[in-house]
Amino acid sequence: MAHDILIVDDEPDISGLVAGILEDEGYSARTARDADGALAEIAARRPNLIFLDIWLQGSRLDGLELLDIIKREHPEVPVVMISGHGNIETAVAAIKRGAYDFIEKPFNADRLVVITERALETLRLRREVRELKQLTQPHTMVGRSSVIQQLRATVDRVGPTNSRILIVGPSGSGKELTARMIHAASARAQGPFVVINAAAITPERLEYELFGVEEGEGRERHRGALEEAHGGTLFLDEIADMPRETQNRVLRVLVEQTFSRIGSSEKVRVDVRIISSTGRHLEEEIAAGRFREDLYHRLSVVPIRVPPLAERREDIPDLVDFFIDLISQTTGLQRRKVGEDAMAVLQSHDWPGNVRQLRNNVERLLILAGGDPDAEVTASMLPPDVGALVPTLPNGNGGEHLMGLPLREAREVFEREYLAAQINRFGGNISRTAEFVGMERSALHRKLKALGVG
């Protein structure tokens, strides 16, 4: 989408000229003649970049005073000062007060375009750095399973469409990551990605964070998530926890594309793509009267399901390797190699907390695993709640090694437990189980039937 640029100059010829040059380059331009007009434009919709005349003749505030207000309320917005001949010292002083750069009158169109491109690129890089500092997840789904390949293909198709998406999946499965992938695949990828988790915010606080608050007696203006996400994507996480009154206001935003801050009747227009998620069955919430059906249909133009980890067990080795690399880089913990027996147990676990639970267990394993740091992590070193899946010998000794051996090397007494665990590990896929244990598919079928393993 086109970047939104505000030009503030008391001379209409100058502001019109700047706006014309920028619009020819594909930008969206607005103008204001004085400080009050500029503040009104910024309040209505925060621009990506501001060109500001230093003097602003006839204005309540001059350019430097207005600059101070802009940098205090919107420190991330770059401001380029417009100066006349003889104002260079003042322009330099403006840079010391937070201006990004300055351009002299009469100015060269090429220089104007270059400064614009550079300022917007700086804005983009700062935003990326801020978002990367918050990220502790991969930028894409890790894994090669068919369900993940299908999910990636769906993201590639819906990302560029600008349609509203409803992501459905259990807690910890990667709903926010899927939303980030959709954002990255869209034309808004260089814009902000803002997250509001309805389950993590009290109902009283939710509207404050979502819509913001107008400046008034005893309170400062607060920009809400809708304004923060202008030009980008707003991710509404766990929308089933959103109060009905807030649902009503969100529906109006979707219908009218405008909203009002708390304490104000003034309409604010934003350009935001909304992606939402839930771990509940919204049809049941609608039937119980807890969620608006019309809002559901507005949000779920394209529904996407993120599978639980139990449906993609074959991705667990890739996920474990990824998390070991990530955790060792961010914490300084030594990398460890996970042995085949331990990996088999990890793949056999049901993981009710999904990918998030797996990550936490990998981190716990790196912290608590003793012994030679160069030695493989074995099943006996796994956390108790996961390692409890390892079968034991009748005499009470551990049988951890059995999970990593072909069937022909396992003792006959353990065939039933061994094969049941392996089938669970591979999600009921007989072909992959047969390949791992070293049997023909037909022979495995006969063995399972003889053992009574379903």
From Swiss-Prot:
Keywords assigned: Activator, ATP-binding, DNA-binding, Nitrogen fixation, Nucleotide-binding, Phosphoprotein, Repressor, Transcription, Transcription regulation, Two-component regulatory system
Described function: Member of the two-component regulatory system NtrY/NtrX involved in the activation of nitrogen assimilatory genes such as GlnA. NtrX is probably phosphorylated by NtrY and interacts with sigma-54.
Originating species: Azorhizobium caulinodans (strain ATCC 43989 / DSM 5975 / JCM 20966 / LMG 6465 / NBRC 14845 / NCIMB 13405 / ORS 571)
SMART domains: AAA (SM00382), REC (SM00448)
Transmembrane segments: none
Gene (UniProt): ntrX
DNA-binding region: 430-449
Designated name of the protein: Nitrogen assimilation regulatory protein NtrX
A single MF term (Gene Ontology): ATP binding
Residues annotated for ATP binding in this entry: 169-176, 229-238
Modification type 4-aspartylphosphate: residues: D53
Gene3D superfamilies the UniProt entry points to: 1.10.8.60, 3.40.50.2300, Homeodomain-like, P-loop containing nucleotide triphosphate hydrolases
InterPro entries attached to this UniProt entry: AAA+_ATPase, CheY-like_superfamily, Homeodomain-like_sf, HTH_Fis, P-loop_NTPase, Sig_transdc_resp-reg_receiver, Sigma_54_int, Sigma_54_int_dom_ATP-bd_2
GO biological process, one term: regulation of DNA-templated transcription
Signal sequence, renumbered to the chain: none
Origin organism lineage: Bacteria, Pseudomonadati, Pseudomonadota, Alphaproteobacteria, Hyphomicrobiales
PANTHER family attached to this UniProt entry: TRANSCRIPTIONAL REGULATOR (NTRC FAMILY) (PTHR32071:SF17), TRANSCRIPTIONAL REGULATORY PROTEIN (PTHR32071)
Domain of life: Bacteria
